[in-house]
């Protein structure tokens, strides 16, 4: 392993909270653009009690990687709590003072992560990127202040690009 890199599995844990009491009715899915999106599923007559609850600050990913345009569906929930299909895997960062979830999401957004996930997927007809493989991902984990400064710099640049795009659209 490269110096300064750590295994992702040292920082994350799976979460399997079901919607047994049907208190959460905000149904979302996860897109290959790494965002939670409104579900297009027809849920008429569907028992939503087995759907998984995703809490704000948790992640979800679809382990099936085939037919996804070489990308993996993974996202960090920044909105209110939601439910997703039980086919997704939900997980969270165990200690947010060691690994910032926003920093981790930046790592997941890299094309290199998508390539790694596709390469490490197993299966013939239906390729799967399993939890164990996700835990084996090696990533640089600088101290938490450095992670937060990287996230802030990225967000600032992204906001400026969007502002310039809006200005250009008005010209």
What residue ranges belong to the model's regions?
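Non-catalytic DNA-recognition/assembly elements of restriction-modification systems
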Residues: 1-19, 140-170
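Sequence-specific dsDNA recognition surfaces
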Residues: 4-61
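Short, positively charged
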Residues: 11, 100-135
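Glycine-rich, flexible loop/turn motifs
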Residues: 24, 40, 44-47, 70-72, ...
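A short beta-sheet element
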Residues: 56, 60-111
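"Short basic amphipathic alpha-helical interaction patches in structured regions
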Residues: 74-78, 105, 120, 152-154, ...
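A short glycine-rich beta-alpha junction/loop motif
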Residues: 82-87, 122-151, 155
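Alpha-helix capping at helix-to-loop junctions
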Residues: 93, 110-114, 126, 134, ...
């Amino acid at each position: 392993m490269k110096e300064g890199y750590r295994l992702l599995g040292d920082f994350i844990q799976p979460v399997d909270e079901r919607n047994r009491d049907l208190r959460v009715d905000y149904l979302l899915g996860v897109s290959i653009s790494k965002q939670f999106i409104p579900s297009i599923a027809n849920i008429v007559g569907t028992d939503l009690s087995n759907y998984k609850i995703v809490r704000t600050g948790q992640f979800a990913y679809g382990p099936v990687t085939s037919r996804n345009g070489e990308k993996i569906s993974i996202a960090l929930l920044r909105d209110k709590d939601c439910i997703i299909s039980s086919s997704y895997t939900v997980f969270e960062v165990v200690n947010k003072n060691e690994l910032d979830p926003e920093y981790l999401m930046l790592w997941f957004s890299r094309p290199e992560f998508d390539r790694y996930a596709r390469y490490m997927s197993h299966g013939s007809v239906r390729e799967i990127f399993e939890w164990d493989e996700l835990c084996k991902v090696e990533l640089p984990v600088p101290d938490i202040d450095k992670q937060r400064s990287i996230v802030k710099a990225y967000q600032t640049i992204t906001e400026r690009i969007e502002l310039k795009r809006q200005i250009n659209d008005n010209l």
